[in-house]
A protein has these predicted regions:
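Conserved ABC ATPase "signature" region
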Residues: 86, 90, 97-115
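The feature captures the beta-strand-to-loop junction immediately N-terminal to the Walker
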Residues: 33-35
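Catalytic Walker B motif of ABC-type/P-loop ATPase nucleotide-binding domains
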Residues: 144-148
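C-terminal coupling/interaction segments
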Residues: 65, 231-271
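ABC transporter nucleotide-binding domain
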Residues: 160-176, 180-238
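Helix-to-loop junction immediately C-terminal to a conserved catalytic motif
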Residues: 48
């Protein structure tokens, strides 16, 4: 991915990120994946301008051109949907005419038009996240930063939230999101996997799956448990390049397999 307008170059945050680089492109959704403690939320806060780095370069627009939806927040629970939108409009200094146009647009996009007088605290989990996205995109930011935007919501709401995110990207917004759902990351145009604050692998999802070194096999019982992981009722097992592959069927790997294989390689290299 070539250097875009926004991103980070070799940024370090002591104990959390170690020389991480990421370029964002307009109209492209970039997904950042990784386990607990990988550094996903830290990177989102850096990109949102909410956290200073110890070293490296951060390339982001001014605060009024960034939309940030932190995990589990992004709205005021004691305000109604309408009041939340009005508060955000005031914070971003939107004129009345522009506010009304944007308000009507985001309410229509999120399906919250019939709930404007409901307290945010009384919304369902999925509706709260839609409100948070409405607030994050109300001012038409150039950069939209989303920290775990679909965590804890039902499958239908996840689909709706992705539709809203895709709408922002289609409008030319730079979109970056952290997610624990690998299947969601496969919908992105570009993926960065972090492990213990370091870059694990990066690229388009299809490129990452085809670039897995060695062979991923699907089997009922693994031959080498240190290189195997459960996928449903069966196991996937990675055989490094150059080693013979036992006679089970070869799996068609996906992004989850690519991330796991990269983590196994990193662990072996760090020993």
């Amino acid at each position: 991915m070539t250097e875009g307008s926004f991103g980070v170059d070799h940024v370090t945050v002591a104990g959390r990120l170690d020389h991480v680089s990421l370029n964002l492109a307009p109209g492209t959704i970039v997904a950042v994946v990784g386990g607990d403690g990988a550094g996903k939320s830290t990177l989102m806060r850096v990109l949102a301008g909410a956290l200073l780095v110890d070293s490296g370069r951060v390339r982001i627009p001014g605060p009024d051109r960034v939309g940030f939806v932190p995990t589990g927040a992004g709205f005021y629970p004691d305000l109604t949907v309408a009041e939340n939108l009005r508060f955000a409009a005031t914070a971003y200094r939107l004129g009345e005419v522009r506010f009304r146009g944007r308000r009507d647009y985001v309410l229509g996009l999120t399906g919250l038009g019939d709930f404007t007088e409901r307290l945010a605290a009384d919304l369902s989990g999925g509706m709260r996240q839609k409100l948070a996205l409405a607030l994050g995109t109300l001012h038409e930011p150039e950069l939209l930063v989303l920290d775990e935007p679909t965590t804890g919501v039902d499958p239908v709401s996840r689909v709706d939230l992705w539709r809203i995110i895709a709408d922002a990207a289609a409008g030319g917004v730079h979109v970056v999101l952290a997610t624990s759902y690998i299947d969601e990351a496969e919908r992105a145009g570009h993926v960065l996997a972090l492990h213990a604050g370091r870059r694990l692998l990066e690229g388009a999802p299809s490129e990452l799956t085809t670039a897995i070194p060695g062979v991923v096999s699907e089997r009922h019982r693994p031959e080498e448990r240190s290189r195997a992981w459960r996928r449903g009722t069966r196991w996937h097992e990675w055989t490094p390049a150059g080693l013979s592959v036992p006679g089970d069927e070869v799996a068609e790997p996906d992004l989850e397999d690519a991330v796991i294989v990269a983590a196994l390689q990193r662990e072996a290299a760090d020993r």
